[in-house]
Amino acid sequence: QLIATIESSYFSQLSVVRNSIPYFPVRIYANEELKTAIFISEISIEPSLYYLVGNTMLNWAKDNECDLIISSSNSVNPQPIDASNPNEYSIAAIGNTVRARNRLKDSKIALLNNGTIGGIPAVLLNQSSVLGIDVIVLLVKIIEGIPDFRAAAELSTTISNLVPGVSCNIPLLLQEAERIEKEITKIKTQGTESEMDAYG
């Protein structure tokens, strides 16, 4: 259920139309039964606004007595991921408190030992401790510029493990992943054949 929107004159002015209904591009949905809220942004947010948006999310979470925030951050792979290797899609994570890290361990999610996290997830991690809110950031491997539905499916499954009751249409995501992988393979094959023809 849509319960709120985040608006700013600094955002790109965009209206997202779904089933003939216009929506603000940055929205908050909530499920009262599951005590779960989801922030959705369908615009790219300027880096200069990360701090403002991150703190807006944290303040909203505090005002609504949320005790856990789950965010995600991309880990870009320069080379294509081997879809046949499940380890390629393993997700690592970081928690801002001992309680958050124990929650990850209980869900058998690997902890990031060393590294950096940027953007809004970094603001959530750095600013949340003073508010007493647990934050978990899931790190997902992607290939830059290519929609990766397998990674999305893995992310959705991981969130479902952390928040029982939250679900997503995983089979549909995997079906889309398979379709896109076949298209990419076909394009690469055609490109290789064209290169061979060029050399006679």
Language model segments and positions:
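Short beta-strand segments
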Residues: F39-I40, S71-S73, L139-K141
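N-terminal short beta-loop-beta anion/metal-coordinating cradle
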Residues: Q1-I43
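Extended, histidine- and acidic-residue-enriched regions that form the cofactor-binding/catalytic faces
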Residues: D134-G200
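Catalytic cores of processing enzymes, dominated by hydrolases/peptidases
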Residues: P78-T158, A198
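A generic local secondary-structure boundary/capping motif
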Residues: V26-I28, L58-N59, L124-N126
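Surface-exposed cleft-lining segments at the edges of enzyme active sites
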Residues: I43-Y50, L111
